Regions:
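A glycine/serine/threonine-rich, flexible loop-to-helix segment
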Residues: 49, 178, 188-213, 253-261
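Catalytic loop of short-chain dehydrogenase/reductase
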Residues: 13-20, 93-128, 136-178, 190-192, ...
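Hydrophobic structural elements of the Rossmann-like NAD(P)H-binding subdomain
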Residues: 11, 89, 141, 183-186, ...
Length: 261
């Protein structure tokens, strides 16, 4: 029997074929789940619909997660289509490019609010809207990054947002524990996604990660999707409120390994 046989999963944040959310959708489908996906905006629709069709995914909905009415509308459609769901994946993060370069203290008030709303509150809003639809024993997963706990030049306000997202994960895990629903986060290494390309000097960060991580390998979207599969399957039935690092061990390092002269 496949790990997600008979499970119903809804995945938010598919943008293109390089998205972490898209990798999750593929892995979950291959693991036996019935999958639905959501995207943001008309431009992305043209990219996402063909991807969804390629794996036989019929539930494809647009959702502006900055609007509660959009979130609630997708929840209503999901209830009509699925009845109940077992898995909710939140793979959404955004900050204006202008906020992801230069000193952090130059973060604008509007930029701070935007990053927190899209990257953090959206997870809370989705959890609240889908709570009535979640089966007992279900799972919610979000995506974070090491910049939540360690300074990452140019990551700036997104680091603050990811720290808040991780705290939100723990509070949601407490709230949903009474319903036997698990809530966890995955902290992946840098990946060449659409969102990552907005971070200033990302190429340097990407190379430095590979050099410093104990495994000396960058992370792929499939690596992250496989971790999500574990967290959303019964294999992790007693795991909640955790931040699972999928980063080739980068998070354990204090200083880079000395390079022989």
């Amino acid at each position: 029997m496949k790990l997600l046989e008979g499970k119903k999963a809804l995945i938010f944040g598919v943008a293109n074929n390089r998205s972490i959310a898209w990798a999750v959708a593929q892995v979950f489908k291959n693991a036996g789940a019935e999958v639905g996906v959501s995207y943001a905006g008309e431009i992305l629709r043209r990219r996402v619909e063909p991807l969804a069709e390629s794996i036989g995914c019929d539930f494809v909905e647009e959702c502006d997660v900055s609007k509660d009415e959009d979130i609630n509308a997708v929840a209503d459609k999901a209830k009509e289509y699925f009845g109940k769901i077992d898995i909710l994946v939140h793979s959404i993060g955004f900050a204006d490019r202008s906020e992801l370069r230069g000193p952090f203290y130059n973060t604008s008030r509007a930029g701070f609010h935007l990053a927190m709303d899209i990257s953090v509150y959206s997870f809370i809003g989705l959890a609240r809207a889908f709570q009535p639809l979640m089966n007992e024993g279900g799972a919610m997963v979000t995506m974070t990054y090491h910049g939540s706990t360690k300074v990452t030049p140019n990551y700036n306000v997104m680091g603050i947002a990811k720290a808040a997202l991780e705290a939100s994960t723990r509070y949601l895990a407490f709230d949903f524990g009474k319903e036997k629903i698990r809530v966890n986060a995955i902290s992946a290494g840098p990946i060449r996604t659409l969102a990552a390309m907005g971070v200033g000097d990302f190429k340097t960060m990407y190379k430095a990660f590979e050099d410093m991580a104990p495994l000396h390998e960058n992370v792929t979207t499939e690596d992250v999707a496989n971790a999500a599969l574990f967290l959303c399957s019964d294999m992790s039935a007693r795991t909640t409120g955790e931040i699972l690092y999928v980063d080739s061990g980068y998070n354990i390092m204090g200083v880079p390994e000395a390079v022989p002269e």
